[in-house]
Curated annotation (Swiss-Prot):
Organism from which the protein derives: Rhodospirillum centenum (strain ATCC 51521 / SW)
Binding site for 2-[(2R,5Z)-2-carboxy-4-methylthiazol-5(2H)-ylidene]ethyl phosphate: 134-136, 164
Lineage start: Bacteria, Pseudomonadati, Pseudomonadota, Alphaproteobacteria, Rhodospirillales
Listed cofactors: Mg(2+)
Family stated for the protein in its record: Belongs to the thiamine-phosphate synthase family.
Keyword Heme attached: no
Protein name: Thiamine-phosphate synthase
Pfam families: TMP-TENI
EC top class, as a word: transferase
InterPro entries per record: Aldolase_TIM, ThiamineP_synth_sf, ThiamineP_synth_TenI, TMP_synthase
Cofactor details (free text): Binds 1 Mg(2+) ion per subunit.
Binding locations of 4-amino-2-methyl-5-(diphosphooxymethyl)pyrimidine: 36-40, 68, 107, 137
Gene: thiE
Length: 207
């Protein structure tokens, strides 16, 4: 199995210009596979403004820039892909909008069936969770780490673990077989700061 990698999710609300240096410092502190811009229920103008500010600094570091929920905006704003939930744009429509070469990831909660369907349809990754309590959003489901192990044994499509992940809880998910750890509060609210959090997560994921 390849090393687990960090998948950063932006805070629920922020000023793009003020947040940019913090994000840059976090990306420079260790390996990060991708950054997901998640501004739930924000107007299109706010989302596009955040993309305009953050996408260049993310992509300049060879890190993928993913937009949450909005394949239409992702396609027109130069994002590397989109992440869709079960109540968002269906996978096939998202793929049509962003194109064959873009990344499309799908939330599958704790459902093996949803994950199998997403994988068979062509999703670039599936996301399971929430594994731990989270203050970022109200989780619809609680997932058992065993689902990561099962997925690794069954499928080649990468899996992302999400939900309340901290430096302290990460080892369990790494050992269970997560390819990526999707982290929000565990980085941005880390006592020593986001850059220290990224460095700590990298140490944990390298064993």
């Amino acid at each position: 199995m390849t090393d687990c990698r960090l998948y950063l999710i932006t805070p629920p609300a922020f000023d793009p210009q003020a947040f940019a240096p913090t994000l840059a410092a976090a990306l420079d502190a260790g390996d990060v596979a991708c950054v997901q811009l998640r501004l739930k229920d924000a107007p299109d103008e706010a989302i596009l403004r955040a993309v305009e500010v953050l996408r260049p600094l993310v992509q300049a570091r060879d890190v993928a820039f993913i937009l949450n929920d909005r394949p239409d905006l992702a396609a027109r704003s130069g994002c590397d892909g989109v992440h869709v939930g079960q109540e968002d744009t269906p996978y096939r429509e998202a793929r049509r909008l962003v194109g064959a070469d873009a990344i499309v990831g799908v939330t599958c909660h704790d459902s093996r069936h949803l994950a199998m369907v997403a994988g068979e349809e062509g999703a670039d990754y599936v996301a399971f969770g929430a594994f731990f309590p989270t203050g970022t959003k109200e989780p619809k489901t609680t997932a058992d780490p065993e689902i990561l192990t099962w997925w690794q044994e069954m499928m080649e499509v990468p899996c992302v673990a999400i939900g309340g992940i901290t430096v302290e809880t990460a080892p369990l998910l790494v050992q269970a077989g997560a390819d990526f750890l999707a982290v929000c509060g565990g980085v941005w609210n880390h006592p020593a700061g986001p850059a220290a959090a990224v460095a700590d997560f990298n140490r944990v994921m390298r064993g």
